[in-house]
Amino acid sequence: MQKILATMMVLALTIAAQAERIDSTQFVAFYNYTIQTQDEEGQNVTDSIRLALLVGTRATYCTTVLSYNKDGRASQEMLDAFSMHFQNVLTDVEKSSVVAVEPIYPYRYETHEPMAKVDWTLTGDTLTISGLLCHRATGKLYGKQWTAWYTEEMPSSAGPWKLRGLPGLIIKAEDAEGIHCFTLYETKNEVIDINMIGSPEYQKLSRKKLMEFKKKTLGNPRYPKEPTYYVPEGADEVLEVNVNGTFYSVGYNSHMMILQKSHVYQPLELE
């Protein structure tokens, strides 16, 4: 019991860990992020998690709502976050640099890269989303073509994940295949710190090396039915955590939730 409680506390502390402050927010934008994919039986499914985009004048930070709320309890939403392999992304606009941290059981991976410039094409199309007048733009990022809707009513060049660079906050963005979609559902005017992310304990890779590793590992046909097929025996100690009658597998050493089944991996980056 003590070990289980300790693991749950470590999960919380891992999510809540803070580092040096580099900026503070002007506001926080909240998005639903969905992925159209297939389950282990090949049936179409929609994966979904909530994201928080912390927007400052110098930097932005995109993470899960669980991390934003410092909620480290084992839950289905946390399991979904691990399943969707969403990166925590810190964009330092002043330095034109991006740091991304992604948990891929049983390790966390950290990449550093220059801030990518999306060559957006602005159009005259408009659409009202959540009461905001939005303008359509198209652009390509890391091998994927995107359609984004932005609003000049919120004068920020920020957007979810690594999408940014438009003359207004990105309200909705969807890739050309209709697989990945980010949709704003709320904003809050609050001032909180934006901190540097990363740790000496994380595995350091280039963005392209991590992309290749994910393609080889998560893109393997075995992955949906055996999400830990590639993990060496003894790499972690697995515990069963009971949360209100629901049991979750948690890595005691990795501080990660462990998937028993997963869905077909759908990469955000192709090149």
Predicted regions and their residues:
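Short, glycine/acidic-rich beta->alpha junctions
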Residues: 45, 118-119, 154, 163-165
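Exposed boundary/loop context
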Residues: 12, 124, 158-161, 238
